[in-house]
Design a protein with these regions (language model features):
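Helix-start/capping segments and mature chain N-termini
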Residues: 1-67, 71-130
Length: 130
């Protein structure tokens, strides 16, 4: 049995995709990112017009590698922001949470601004862990 998701009860809810853009290749996996966003939009009853999003993505132009963040609101408004992707000069030290996730939690299937679980767990990390 599928658990319903009540998107209207979460103020400012957005779907999120973050992707790489490179001067020589554009956004290599953008098809996969937009497919995932489209599926989530359909499931969560978000308006999704891929042609407008594609138009915006095709206008990206930079001599640098970019970290791009695409957000979509329930009424179909989207925002695309970019930032120069700086080389990572340090080793990452990671930590694992002791919390057990529930496969019944429908929010784990969607990349959204509903990130309470992630924020709570990240706040528990000791200094120096990524």
């Amino acid at each position: 049995m599928e658990i319903p998701i009540y998107t209207s009860s979460i103020e400012g809810l957005e779907l999120i995709e973050t992707f790489l853009w490179e001067p020589e290749h554009g956004a290599p996996d953008i098809d996969l990112h937009l497919e995932r966003m489209c599926k989530s939009a359909g499931k969560l009853k978000f308006k999704f017009e891929s042609s407008k999003i594609w138009e915006k993505i095709h206008k990206i132009n930079s001599e640098n590698r970019l970290r791009c963040r695409l957000t979509l609101t329930i009424d179909g408004k989207f925002n695309l922001t970019t930032a120069v992707l700086q080389p990572n000069s340090k080793k990452w030290i990671i930590g694992l949470s002791n919390s057990v996730l529930s496969s019944a939690d429908p929010w784990l299937l969607h990349k959204s601004s509903n990130r309470e679980l992630y924020d709570t767990e990240r706040a528990k990390l000791p200094d120096g862990l990524d």
